[in-house]
Regions:
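Conserved RNase H-like, two-metal-ion catalytic cores of nucleic-acid enzymes
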Residues: 1-118
């Protein structure tokens, strides 16, 4: 199977990703972190990986060494995605160990609505 994977490097691409999730009604999400405890001051979500269909996916660099490619701070990117996708009850969220990912969303003021398949 051919797999397409993209690193989101501009706000325009982030908007396109959100549109794709809205169009399919699905978003598979998974955070990568710096492995610090979530409640430590040193905790950092580094990447949010998202897929909206089989065979494709995107990585959104957050507090990652590649952050310099973005014109908008990482938290604004996360909140933009979160408000439109994670908080959208019409989009089915798919995850593995969502209780961890959800803790990160909540830490940054994003509250899941709708169906979650874990």
């Amino acid at each position: 199977m051919f797999t397409r994977y993209k690193i989101i490097r501009s706000f325009r691409e982030l908007k396109q990703l959100v549109e794709a999730c809205l169009n399919t009604g699905y978003a598979s999400v998974d955070f990568e972190t710096n492995a610090e405890g979530i409640y430590k001051d040193t905790f950092k979500p580094t990447i949010l990986s998202v897929s909206f269909q089989v065979g494709s996916g995107c990585s959104i660099p957050l507090q990652h060494f590649d952050e310099s490619v973005k014109e908008i701070p990482w938290l604004k990117w996360l909140q933009y995605f979160g408000r439109r996708v994670v908080e959208n009850p019409n989009i089915v969220k798919v995850a593995q160990n969502f209780k961890f990912d959800n803790q990160i969303f909540v830490k940054y003021g994003i509250y899941v609505r709708g169906t979650v398949i874990d």
